Amino acid sequence: MLGKTQADQGAAVIRAERLGKTYAEGKMRTPVFDGLDLSVATGETVAIVGASGAGKSTLLHLLGGLDIPTSGEVYVAGRRMSALSDGERGKLRNRSLGFVYQFHHLLPEFTALENVMMPVLLSGQDVSIARGQALQLLESVGLGHRVEHKPSELSGGERQRCAVARALVNKPGCVLGDEPTGNLDDKTAGTVFELMLELNRAQRTSLVLVTHDRSLARRLDRVLELHQGKLRELAPSAV
């Protein structure tokens, strides 16, 4: 296991054991990594860094149940993902995880409010509850005055703040971010990053962020480097 601050099995919001992924095309086999162990505690913030093509996004997809590992297990909120049906995995993701990507993936035909309401509606809550939770989150990310605007009417930073609100609206145990500030200018990226840290502190939501920005990575609790198929924790001086 990695890191002195890492949670024990009972307290982990996400846990991976001996995780491996190999891509197959015909007779060709391309191993990405094998035997990775990782545990993320409640409220902990973790950066994953590494060279392009190292498998960082693949690891994030496996942790989020968006892809199936070749070997090993992923546990989310104590539940083994491989033991769940596709439908059960989808419900667990919606309830326990939030996702923020480099590109916002907002639905263009819906307003900011409707986009943020969507995860709550998918969890089975009624419209009034979904609207209330979405309005509260949009206000907290500084978009209370833009709730009726569609993504095309928002700036890049506003769209990403809306995506952060959508990721957090169901109060997930962990948010997984794949270069969430990578498509923004430095000033806007800093604003969005600060927002994610503020919400992490306020809600005790864990963060696992893939980033190429070492200056941002240094501000998280732990920095893990994926290198040649192995995951290692970096000392602060090495980040």
Curated annotation (Swiss-Prot):
Gene Ontology terms, cellular component aspect?
plasma membrane
Q: Does the keyword Cell inner membrane apply?
A: yes
One Pfam family hit: ABC_tran
The ABC transporter domain sits at 14-239
Q: What is its EC number?
A: 7.6.2.-
Q: How does it sit in the membrane?
A: Peripheral membrane protein
Instruction: Indicate which residues the UniProt annotation says bind ATP.
Output: G50, A51, S52, G53, A54, G55, K56, S57
In its UniProt record, which GO terms are filed under biological process? Answer: lipoprotein localization to outer membrane; protein localization to outer membrane; transmembrane transport
Task: Tell me the leader sequence span.
Answer: none
Location relative to the cell: Cell inner membrane
Chief subcellular location equals membrane
Subunit (UniProt):
The complex is composed of two ATP-binding proteins (LolD) and two transmembrane proteins (LolC and LolE).
NCBIfam families associated with the record: LolD_lipo_ex
Similarity section: Belongs to the ABC transporter superfamily. Lipoprotein translocase (TC 3.A.1.125) family.
Function statement = Part of the ABC transporter complex LolCDE involved in the translocation of mature outer membrane-directed lipoproteins, from the inner membrane to the periplasmic chaperone, LolA. Responsible for the formation of the LolA-lipoprotein complex in an ATP-dependent manner.
> What protein is this chain from?
Lipoprotein-releasing system ATP-binding protein LolD
By which gene is this protein encoded? Answer: lolD
